[in-house]
């Protein structure tokens, strides 16, 4: 009986360890997908990547919260890639995903869910704020900020949290503590806390744009070179560099 009890306890502990690791692997794979998306050669290739990834989420054995998290992150990337030309479709997609998050979060505290979901939902709301005005815009922006802050409260060294919050700060007005300087600090934290090549690549990429906004092209170029060195076959940093020379930031 003692051996059976020990084995039962061991099995429970193993499950507790494996499940978060499986989820973390899924989130790491999302970043790989995101980089592939950035480096896709055409709109058709982007759409193909998105559909393949959507099917991958649907077929996975992740739980409800983890699947919702990945679909939320995917919705953000899909609308970002679609651009302003697809504004109506983007608004519909963002609103639908926001509703799914609200339904899942009903009766739950923000502190009860994983940091990736908090950041993904915050990204959804920050983009919805761009479709709003007046009090609605203020409410969406404020709620997104609280979600970012809750995620970073749970994990102060969460690279994606600092990255997304940095982007929020970049577009936020100075009265809300925003601006390129504030964004640079957040992006720099994302660089410092990166644990994988994918995390560092994205953090360097975003930080380079803050440097451009602050008229420091040398540091921007250094970040883009460092990002490229992580994935020598990638081509996106070259496109970003060319855009910067023409006064364009890749996330604007």
Name each region found by the language model:
Residues 49, 90, 94-97, 144, ...:
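Single-residue signature of alpha-solenoid repeat helices
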Residues 53, 94, 98-101, 105, ...:
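Hydrophobic/aromatic packing residues within the alpha-helices of TPR/SEL1-like helical repeat arrays
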Residues 61-65, 105, 159, 194-200, ...:
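Boundary/linker segments of alpha-helical solenoid repeat arrays
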Residues 8-18:
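Bacterial N-terminal signal peptides
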Residues 25-36, 61-85, 111-132, 157-173, ...:
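Amphipathic alpha-helical repeat scaffolds of TPR domains
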Residues 56, 104, 151, 190-193, ...:
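Canonical positions in the second alpha-helix
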Residues 43-46, 87, 91, 141, ...:
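TPR-repeat structural position
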């Amino acid at each position: 009986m003692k051996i059976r009890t020990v084995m039962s306890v061991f099995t429970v502990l193993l499950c507790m360890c494996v499940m978060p690791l499986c989820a973390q692997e899924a989130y790491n794979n999302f970043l790989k997908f995101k980089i592939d998306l950035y480096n896709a050669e055409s709109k058709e290739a982007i759409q193909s990547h998105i559909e393949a990834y959507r099917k991958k989420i649907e077929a996975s054995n992740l739980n409800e919260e983890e699947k919702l998290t990945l679909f939320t992150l995917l919705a953000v990337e899909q609308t970002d890639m679609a651009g302003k030309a697809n504004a109506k479709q983007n608004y519909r997609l963002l609103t639908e995903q926001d509703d799914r998050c609200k339904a899942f979060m009903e009766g739950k505290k923000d502190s009860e869910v994983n940091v990736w979901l908090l950041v993904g939902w915050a990204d959804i709301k920050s983009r919805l704020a761009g479709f709003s005005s007046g009090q609605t815009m203020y409410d969406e922006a404020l709620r997104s900020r609280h979600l970012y802050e809750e995620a970073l409260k749970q994990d102060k060294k969460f690279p994606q949290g600092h990255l997304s919050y940095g982007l929020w700060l970049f577009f936020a007005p100075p009265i809300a503590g925003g601006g390129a300087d504030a964004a640079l600090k957040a992006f720099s934290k994302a660089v410092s806390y990166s644990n994988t090549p994918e995390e560092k690549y994205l953090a360097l990429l975003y930080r380079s744009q803050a440097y451009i906004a602050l008229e420091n092209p040398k540091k921007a170029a250094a970040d883009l070179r460092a990002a490229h060195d992580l994935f020598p076959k990638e081509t996106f940093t070259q496109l970003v560099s060319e855009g910067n020379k023409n006064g364009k930031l890749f996330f604007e």
